[in-house]
Amino acid sequence: MDALKPFLPEAKGVLPYYMIILSIISIGNSLQAYTTLHFSRRVYNGRFIRNPKLPSKTNNFEPEDQTNKLIPAQNDPKATDQLTPLAGRLFGTWTLITCIVRCYAAYNLHIGPVYTLAYWTYIVAFSHFASELFVFKTMTFGLPQYFPFALASTSLIWMPLVRDHYVQYN
């Protein structure tokens, strides 16, 4: 453990270590998003079919450009998920950017704006997962979805409670 000490955040308390651990996990998540869709498809497991109510393509209308071109159909045998290689890479990139912000914040929790930026990463993550579950229906709730919700929720509750302990400069 002494060999790791120079690399660990100096701030007192558990929050910086929590953020470092989540960042390390996020690096792995980002890498897997670039190499396989398997794990992301377990999270984004909603099933969809083409929207039969959309009109056919015309000179003025392109069904492929519509955000509602697919509709939820969890029990339809023809239904597929929406995860594509592009979506996987975008999610991997977003996760890596979030990881960088949280990792930087773990070492700089004493700076108010940095603390706030880290907090916003959890707000965005929670909002994303909640909207995918409740609005866009790209996931159903189960064990793979539990962890993103639990980690983001924990941070959203915990960080405001301990802000004054860490932040020295607003």
From Swiss-Prot:
Q: Name one GO molecular function term.
A: protein-macromolecule adaptor activity
Please tell me one Gene Ontology term that the record gives under cellular component: endoplasmic reticulum membrane
Annotated membrane topology is: Multi-pass membrane protein
Q: Which InterPro entries match?
A: Erg28
Is this entry keyworded Repressor?
no
Which of UniProt's keywords are assigned here?
Answer: Endoplasmic reticulum, Lipid biosynthesis, Lipid metabolism, Membrane, Steroid biosynthesis, Steroid metabolism, Sterol biosynthesis, Sterol metabolism, Transmembrane, Transmembrane helix
Give the pathway listed in the UniProt entry for this protein: Steroid metabolism; ergosterol biosynthesis
BP-aspect Gene Ontology terms: sterol biosynthetic process
| Pfam families, sorted | Erg28
Task: Report the protein's function.
Answer: Sterol 24-C-methyltransferase; part of the third module of ergosterol biosynthesis pathway that includes the late steps of the pathway. The third module or late pathway involves the ergosterol synthesis itself through consecutive reactions that mainly occur in the endoplasmic reticulum (ER) membrane.
Q: What is this protein called?
A: Ergosterol biosynthetic protein 28
| Species of the source | Gibberella zeae (strain ATCC MYA-4620 / CBS 123657 / FGSC 9075 / NRRL 31084 / PH-1) (Wheat head blight fungus)
